[in-house]
Amino acid sequence: MGSEQRKDPRVPSYAKAVFLDRQIPGYIRDLSRSGCRVSFMQPISAGVGDLITVQVIAEHDPAIAPFTVRLRVRRIVSDVLWYSLGTQIEAIVDPKEAEAFDRLVSYYSTTSGGK
């Protein structure tokens, strides 16, 4: 696999995610301040360039409140088990949700040796 070329390198992570338009469950698989990979258990109705809204639930740390994030789909990869989207963070409007997002990124950046 090639070397990481993102401005904000992604780190392995794990948090529950729900595609809000259809209540489809999934998981955040990697994360950075500018994007994430979200894997769903079934295909969702979004294509490259579309905006989606996902609720993120950090079960590992109840101090991190669930938050909602708008994501721009940049890549779609489908296999037998997962429908994965490479996404760019588009918006987190609420300051408390932005704080929860920052805490989640910091947690995984620290635990996986990221920046």
What are these regions (language model features)?
Residues 1-36, 102-115:
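N-terminal helix initiation/capping motif
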Residues 8, 41-46:
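Short, surface-exposed secondary-structure edge patches
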Residues 15-20, 49-66:
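Short conserved beta-strand and strand-loop elements enriched in small hydrophobics
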Residues 25-28, 67-76:
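Short beta-strand-centered aromatic/proline hotspots
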Residues 39-43, 88-91:
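A structural micro-motif recognizing beta-strand termini
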Residues 59-61, 76-78, 92-94:
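Short coil/turn motifs at secondary-structure junctions
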Residues 80-115:
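C-terminal output/interaction extensions
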